[in-house]
C-alpha cells in the first residue's frame, strides 16, 4: 500500500481517472478557480434548496458532467480539469475521507457501541458478506460489459458499503432512538473499515484469488486490524493530552486536532494498515469530555462545514470524470442495469436485516419488526462508495474499455438511495409510530410548556413593577408571549386521546429523564472543575449503560466497579506487607564476659550483613546460568561442584549466626523459614551429587540429582525481598489513586442526585410519581453518603488532599472570574490580563502534581476549621485552653435524644450515625396541625462535622441520637466553656453561630431558590449580605421588599399581622407579607438583602480595594490588619 501511495507509476505518464491524456503544455492555475466555483455553487444551492440535499448533489453531479463533456470537446476546459484527471484515486480518498470518518466516529456513542459491540460487529460482517456475494453474482449475471471476476468482486464490495454520513441523517430529525442511529453508524463504520482493509491489500500487494488460500494473508489482516486499532487508540490519548493543557487556546487546539486526524491517517497508511479503521478508533475514544465546551462546539461546526464542502466537491468531481468519457459508451442497457442494481441493493439489505433480527431482538427489548422495516431502508450509499469506485478499474486484473462506468453506476445508485431510501425510511418510521412521542413523554412536554409559561408570566409581573416600563402596553405583551402549545413534528395528537397510561409507563419516562439530568450534571461538574475527567467519564458511561435497562435507577453500587479493584489492591498490599522483611532487634543483653555473642549480635543486626546476603544471591546468578547450559556444564563440572560447596558454606554460616542470636524467633519470620528450606534443599543436593559419584550407574539417583540441581533456582527467591518495598509503594500509590477516583465519583453522584431532585417537579406529571422519585433519589443519595463517609474514614489523608486540591481550584477559579470582571470594566489592560492569567493557569496546572495524600492535622488545628471562629487567634486560643479530647469506641453513644446537651463535639477522626425524627424547628406539635407523624431519617457524621450546636444555643433537649460507627475522636467543648465564650465575646460569637446555622438550614431546604446568591459565611459577615433577626413571642418586624430580597424563617414560627396566616420554619415568607409577628418563644429569621444593595456593598469593597491597590497598596494592608 505504501508503495502505491508514494511511488510514481512506472511509465512516464501517470494513470488518469478518465479521459484522454494531454498532448499540450498544462497550466494548473485555473483548477483552483474550478474548485472555488463548485464550493460557491454548492453553498448557493444548499441555501436555496434547504432540506433537499439529494437535489443539490444531483445538480452538482449534472454540472460536473456538463463540465466534463465540455472538457472532452474543448482543449481550454480540458486544461482546467486535467489536474483532477491525473490525480490518483487513492489521493482523492486520502484528501476527503479522513475528516468525514473522524466526524462520524466522533458522533457515535461509544458506550452504546461498547454495550452492543458483538451485535454491531456481526451485523457489519453479515451485511458485508451478503452484499459482496449477491451483488457480485447479479453483476456477473446481468452486466453486458466484459468485467472479470475480480472487477465484479471489487464492484460488489464498493456498492455494498453503507455511507455512515447519509445513512442516519434523515432519522436524526424525527425523534428516532439514538440507540438505532448508533447501531446503523457502527455497522457502516465496520463495513467501511473492512472495505478499506480489502482495498488496501489489493492496492498494496496486487494479490490474486489464489493467494487468499495462504496463511500470510490471515496474518496481514490481523496486523491491519489490530495495528490500526492500537495506533488509533494511542493517537486518541495524544489528542486528549493536547486538549487537556490549560495553556492551549482554541485556535491551537483546533489546528492540532485537524492535523492529528490527517497525520494519523497518513502514518497508518504508510505503515501498510487501515487509516479508516485507525480514525474510527480515534473518534470512538474521544467524547464530549475531551473537549472544552466552546472548543467542542467550534470543532463540530468545522467538521460539518468541511464534510459538506467535501461532499459537494466529490459529487462534482466524479460528475466531471464521467463527462470526460465518450457518450457512445452509454447504451440503453445501462438504465435497466442501474435499476437492477438498485433493487438488488435493497433486497440485500432486507436479507441482512432478516438474518440479524434474532441477534438484535435478543440484545434490545425495544427491537421488533417495525424497527426492522425502518433499518432495511438505511442502506444508503454516498461519498465512500464514490471514493472507492475508481479503484475497481485500477485494481482489476483485466482493464476494461470504459472505466467511468464503474463510477457512473455507483454515483447514480447513491443518488437514488439518498432520495428514495431516505424518504421511504422517514415515512415508514412515521407510519409505524416509531418517532411518535409516548403519552408520558407528551405529558412531560406539556408540563414543561406550562412551566415555561409560568416563568414568562412571572417575568411580566416583575417588569410591571419597574417605573421605567409603566407606559408599556402589557396587554399586547401578554398576548404576544402567550404559549398555548409548542408544536413538535413527531407528536401524535390522536394518541393523546386514545392511549391509556399507567404509573409504570410514567415512572419509566421519568427514569429516563432522571438519567439525562444526571448525565448533564456530570458534564456540568466536569466543566466547572468539580469532577476529574476520568470520574466524569466513568459516571457518564455507567449512566448510559443503565439507561437502556427498563426500570433501573443507577445507584452508587452500580458505578463502584473500581471498588473491587481497590479491594484487590488492598489485599495485594497486605500480602506484600506480610512478606516485607524487617529487622526487629530482640531484647538481648549479652553477658559482659561473652564478647563473642556481643560481636555476633552486632553483625546480625547490621545493614552490611543484609547487603552481603543479597550480594551472595546476585553473584550466584552466573554459576546458575552455567549449570543450566548443558554444554558449559559439561566443561565445568568440578568447578561448579566446588562453587556449590562454597555458596552452601556461606548459606550455612548466615543461618547459623541468625539462629545463635534469634533462637526460636528465627522461624517466626517467613524469609528466615525460606532460607532454612533453601539450606536443607542445598544439603540434600550435595549428598545427591556425592552419592552419584559413588553409584554412577543408578539411573533413579541421577534423575533425582538433576531435579535437585534445577531446584537451585529457589536460591534466588530471597532477592524478592529487595522488590517487596518497591511493590508496596507502587500498590499504595495505586490504592490512593483508586480511592481518590472513587471519592470523586461518589461526590459527583451525590451532586447529580441533588440536581435531579431539584428538577423532578417538572419530570413528574403526578404527585404519586413525584413521591416515588423523591424516595428513590433520597435512598440512592443516602447510600452514596454512607459510602463517602466510609471512604473518608478509610483514607483520611487521601480525602484531605482531594478537598484541599478542590479548595485551591475553587479559589483560582474565583480569581479568574474576578480578573475577567476587572478587565471588562477597563481597570486592567488586556496585556496585563494575559500575564496575570498565565500566572493563575500555571498554578492551576501545578495541581496535576498535587500530592495524593496529606497527613491529617492535629486536633488543635481543627479548631481553625470551625467557621464561626473565623480563624481568629483570640477565639481559637480561648477554646484551645478549654477543649478536651474525647475518644469513643465503635458502638458507643455520643449523645442521646431527650437528654440535655453537655457541650459540642468537633469530630477529628472516625464516623458516627445520627438517628432522628424530622426536626421540630422549635414548633410545638399543637401549633402545627398539618404536621402528622414525623419521619425517621439517618445522617452520617465524619471528620470536621460538629454535633450539638443548636441544642447548646437553646439549652434544650437533644432531638437526635448519635452512635459511633467506628472508633472516633472528637474535640469536646463543654456547655459551660461555650457560654463563657459567649460572655467573653458578646454578642458576636453567639450571633455568628446562629448565622451559620441559619445559612445551612436555608441552603438545605431552599437551594434551588438561592442558587444565584453568594451566601458564603465570610461575605455575610463582611458585607452584611445576609443577617439574622430574632423575634420573641408577640414581637413584630416590618418587611421591606425594596431592601429585603428573601426573608426565611429558619427557627420558630411567625404570623402575617395583616392576614394572620401562620408561617412555620423552615419557610420563605412571601413578598406579599409586609409585617410579621413571632408566635414562638424564640424565632429566627434569615434576611437576605436585595441584589442592588448587596451589589453596591460588594462593588464598594471591590472598587475600594482596587483603588487602594493602585494608589496605596501598603496602606491597604495595614488597614486590613487593623480591621482584623
UniProtKB/Swiss-Prot annotation:
Topology with respect to the bilayer: Multi-pass membrane protein
PROSITE patterns: CNMP_BINDING_3
Cellular compartments annotated: Membrane
Coiled coil: none
GO molecular function: potassium:proton antiporter activity; sodium:proton antiporter activity
Gene Ontology BP annotations: potassium ion transmembrane transport; regulation of intracellular pH; sodium ion import across plasma membrane
Protein keywords: Antiport, Glycoprotein, Ion transport, Membrane, Sodium, Sodium transport, Transmembrane, Transmembrane helix, Transport
Transport is among the record's keywords: yes
GO CC terms, sorted: plasma membrane
Transmembrane segments: 25-45, 52-72, 90-110, 120-140, 179-199, 224-244, 254-274, 305-325, 335-355, 372-392, 405-425, 612-632, 641-661, 674-694, 706-726
Protein family (similarity comment): Belongs to the monovalent cation:proton antiporter 1 (CPA1) transporter (TC 2.A.36) family.
This protein's domain notes: Contains an ion transport-like region is related to the membrane segments of voltage-gated ion channels.
Protein name: Sodium/hydrogen exchanger 11
Source species: Homo sapiens (Human)
